[in-house]
Amino acid sequence: MTAGAFSDVVRARLMARSGGFCEVRVPGCWDEASQAHHRRPRGLGGSRSPQTGQASNGLMVCLPCHQHLETVERGEARDRGWIVRQGADPREIPVYRYRQWVLLDDEGGLSPAGVVA
């Protein structure tokens, strides 16, 4: 397995948490999740961090949403916790998911973040 990649166990946790639906949902979303997105990118040294391959660092997304996150709008993605800066702990960064702010854990669970947007 590539350093920082999601294991089959973690991918299963991400899919269970998402229910098979895209967790980002920008305009043009296909709804069905087909890819695992790293909130804290693996580049720039991120793949060496043990947190990179954990469920708190992942979101299940559809292709259009993944392309949006990776190429179009990094500012919005950071503001919504869909992308996390290197050095940050994804477990501590709220993410906007299904119209609410949540914190993700490494077991594939989530809890309300108490963020007022």
Please place each PLM-identified region on the residue numbering.
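Short flanking/linker segments adjacent to small metal-binding domains or redox-active Cys/His motifs
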Residues: 82-117
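Short microdomains enriched in Cys/His and/or Lys/Arg
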Residues: 43-63, 80-95
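Charged/polar, solvent-exposed surface patches and flexible loops
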Residues: 12-16, 75-80
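Short Cys/His-centered divalent metal-binding micro-motifs
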Residues: 27-34, 43, 55-79
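Terminal targeting/leader modules
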Residues: 3-4, 9, 41, 46-47, ...
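Short, charged surface segments at domain edges that flank catalytic/cofactor-binding sites
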Residues: 1-21, 46-56, 94-95
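Short cysteine-rich loop/turn motifs with clustered Cys
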Residues: 6-37, 60-65
